[in-house]
């Protein structure tokens, strides 16, 4: 549990929290995005802004709000870039069009808001047609205050073999980044109807160059529990050439300390369903403990389109699904995230 004296930096320099303020080299990406899961599994959302050097005046953004009954409100696009500077003159704001992120206190408190329209769709429609025609629109107003609940995790920092894997081509799929679990409260207003909520979430800060050529899939899961325990993992599937694949995880136990772990059982993506999917996992810590965490999704969202694929895009490039799940660890339940991707050739599609 985070307190006023609890170190939430994880050793990451404070200036990593500040956004890139001036136009960088073409291709460099500076992104802030969050996953948010309502504490009772009634709905969940993903919101993000991606600032790209060669389109600096109009940052990209994405939004999905998914309800447990299968309703989805979705928007992809770009917008007029907000000033990166907060009231104190520091580069604490990443915003564009209807989306705004603001760092209030590094590694402790962030705000996110969305005010605009979103297209009506459903989890089933996205399975059948991820590039669906946007014909029905809904007014949407979101405001969330996020309080960080654990120190950030920098992928590649916990296991030597993970650092080695990310030091090569596999690191280009992810780009330099860290992620931090949080708890939050906020309001969700859909067509004038206001709903107040409490939730759990994961915040990602990513700055650097990113490439996807050669990417072959992944499984990424994380959550924080009411008693302060938490876990996270990210793993790429075993390689066809038998070479080492990136695989890294961790737990935070009741003592508040992060213990590195290796994923030994994960729920690879094999088919698209709308929810109710078993996404249980097993981690093996470096001190020899086997940690089993049960998981069941309460809503699954196949990743939307929103960008023009290059003409040389591989036919077997991985398909992506973002989902939100109930996780249970030694009898205690919470809500958290899971994102997976797999090549169509290994899926039931």
Question: Which functions belong to the PLM regions below?
Answer:
Residues 1-349:
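Structured soluble/peripheral alpha/beta segments that form catalytic or ligand/cofactor-binding pockets
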